[in-house]
Amino acid sequence: MIDTLKNIKVKDVMTKNVITAKRHEGVVEAFEKMLKYKISSLPVIDDENKVIGIVTTTDIGYNLIRDKYTLETTIGDVMTKDVITIHEDASILEAIKKMDISGKKEEIINQLPVVDKNNKLVGIISDGDIIRTISKII
């Protein structure tokens, strides 16, 4: 099965129509967008479609409940800036390894923004995409 996972490209199983955010968007607006589309993260992109950050429902929701944000708080204020991405031609096995960056349960990444050779966002791959792919193999 390992060899099979090495031969399946990220671009073949990723979600291509990615819901994104811009740094100037408000956190409430971004949270509503995540709830509307039933997604758990938003890659933050610049005007050239390059990934500059990421926000998650957990991060935003938790802090909204605790009143840590004002109505003026933007995605740029709260996004994670050191985003781990993966190239569209990488293998599923590489994606799995990137998602488990430290081997610690609390540090597993659930989604990876997928970029092309110009570092532009072309998709997103989730743990669910990978599980569905593996379930077809076994």
UniProtKB/Swiss-Prot annotation:
PROSITE patterns reported for this sequence: CBS
Domain of life assignment: Archaea
Keyword Repeat: yes
A family per Pfam: CBS
Domain CBS stretches: 14-70, 79-138
Record bears the keyword Repeat: yes
Alphabetical keyword list: CBS domain, Repeat
InterPro entries reported for this sequence: CBS_dom, CBS_dom_sf, CBS_domain-containing
Protein name: Uncharacterized protein MJ0922
Native source species: Methanocaldococcus jannaschii (strain ATCC 43067 / DSM 2661 / JAL-1 / JCM 10045 / NBRC 100440) (Methanococcus jannaschii)
